[in-house]
Design a protein with these regions (language model features):
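Short, cysteine-centered beta-strand-loop-beta hairpins and adjacent loop/turn segments enriched
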Residues: 91-101
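Generic short beta-strand segments
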Residues: 35, 87-93, 126
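Hydrophobic/aromatic beta-strand elements that line small-molecule binding cavities or substrate pockets
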Residues: 57, 71-76, 89-91, 105-111
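Residue-level signal for tight coil/turn positions that link beta-strands
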Residues: 80-82, 114
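A solvent-exposed, acidic/Ser-Thr-rich amphipathic alpha-helical stretch
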Residues: 6, 10-12, 25-78, 100
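Short beta-strand edge/turn micro-motifs at domain boundaries
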Residues: 101-132
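Generic hydrophobic alpha-helical segments
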Residues: 15-16
Length: 132
């Protein structure tokens, strides 16, 4: 694994997180592969395709507000043109007048296309959520 490539994949993951947190969905779209898949926690169903993934982020951006988002324990492993990036997160958000605290682990598979990392696949696990 190339350390510069791992650092590059980690930086791409941070850019993805910043884009959805600030509602920059056009920018986020440019960081997702058109065939991206999201397997929700527990793997019950799936969202397939960039438009479906963006719809989930759009719903969040239109109906919730991120108060606080912290990522930690970010690890990126790169093999060839594929990166597996995982991180723990803690966040506080407001939705429908209620404040909630959520935590868990996010796992993304990224692939390098024309010099840029694109999201291919995502899931979340170890999730906990409760009123804040």
């Amino acid at each position: 694994m190339s350390l510069p490539e791992a650092a590059s994949a980690a930086a791409a993951m941070r850019q993805i997180n910043q884009a959805w947190q600030t509602g920059r969905l056009d920018e986020l779209a440019s960081m997702l592969h058109r065939g991206m898949v999201m397997a929700p926690p527990g793997f019950g169903g799936r969202a397939q395709g960039r438009d479906a993934i963006l719809a989930g982020f759009r719903d969040y951006c239109e109906n919730a507000r991120t108060v606080e988002f912290n990522e930690h324990d970010l690890q990126a492993d790169v093999i060839g043109d594929v990166a597996i990036v995982t991180f723990r997160y803690d966040m506080v958000y407001e939705r429908a007048g209620a404040r909630s605290r959520a935590s868990g682990r996010d796992l993304w598979v990224l692939q390098k296309h024309s010099g840029s990392w694109l999201g291919l696949w995502r899931t979340m696990f170890d999730m906990e959520e409760h009123p804040s």
